[in-house]
């Protein structure tokens, strides 16, 4: 953490995660086969290119610190079968800087307690979901990456989002692909969290694809003439219902637990079959 802070990463948290395996003790009391899963989060960058540079630099620094202490580190998505893999949840947002210097979050609605997102915000998430099958090869491109995306380990398997049951109750659904992060008292914090990347995802390509897909959805939302309520209705549609932009035969929003409340057959029918 100190090494990352020195380089301007501004680490916000570092803690043990649910992965890892129990260590062993030999006959003389020595501990061996120690394997823990750790999480590090650092402050976002307003420049997507700088954010990708930071991710690459952090990986190099972490590996070097471990090496100096006689330890090994793995950034594989699924280094050990049967336990939780390693993800790299990627947060993306959209803001505008006015001539006055004021920054406005373009995803946030005018009233945080009466709506989830702005028109641009709905277009953003709809674009990512509608185009995710084209994005996915740039996110999960290896067998190791797909091995992580399995039910039972809080890793996403369906192209679906969660907004929350009510605008005043932010979502805490950890079973979806893209989450909406909101702070009712801080509209500038409104952003999306993509939960499928792993530490070896090429973040340069991933972020580029995300914003291109988002732009496609934003163009639809803005040019459709629909307001936030109508766009929310399309995002929340049921499978089989017609839509102006999203596919007819699938759903894109779920406030239930995708793993616990659906069988695999139901998930495939409602949200589409996953690529893995």
State the predicted function of each range.
Residues 1-276:
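Glycine-rich, acidic/polar active-site loops that bind/position phosphate-bearing ligands
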């Amino acid at each position: 953490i100190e090494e990352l802070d020195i380089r301007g990463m501004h680490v916000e948290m570092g803690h043990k995660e649910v992965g890892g395996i129990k260590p062993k003790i030999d006959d003389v009391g020595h501990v061996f086969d120690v394997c823990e899963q750790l999480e590090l989060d650092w402050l976002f960058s307003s420049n997507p290119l700088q954010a990708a540079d930071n991710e690459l630099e952090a990986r190099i620094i972490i590996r070097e610190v471990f090496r100096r202490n006689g330890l090994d580190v793995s950034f594989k998505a699924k280094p050990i079968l049967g336990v939780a893999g390693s993800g790299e949840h990627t947060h993306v947002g959209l803001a505008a800087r006015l001539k006055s210097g004021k920054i406005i979050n373009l995803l946030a609605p005018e009233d945080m307690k009466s709506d989830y997102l702005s028109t641009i915000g709905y277009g953003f998430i709809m674009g990512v979901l509608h185009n995710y099958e084209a994005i996915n090869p740039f996110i999960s491109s290896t067998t190791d990456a797909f091995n992580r995306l399995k039910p039972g380990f809080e890793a996403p398997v369906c192209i679906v989002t969660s907004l929350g049951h009510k605008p005043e109750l932010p979502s805490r659904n950890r079973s979806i692909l893209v989450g909406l992060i909101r702070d009712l008292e801080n509209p500038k914090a409104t952003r999306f969290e993509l939960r499928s990347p792993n530490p070896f995802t090429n973040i340069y390509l991933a972020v580029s694809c995300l914003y291109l897909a988002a732009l496609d959805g934003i163009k639809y939302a803005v040019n459709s003439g629909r307001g936030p309520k109508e766009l929310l209705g399309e995002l929340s549609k049921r499978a089989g219902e017609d839509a102006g932009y999203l596919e007819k035969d699938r759903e894109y929003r779920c406030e239930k637990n995708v793993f616990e409340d659906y069988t695999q057959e139901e998930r495939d029918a409602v949200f589409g079959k996953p690529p893995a």
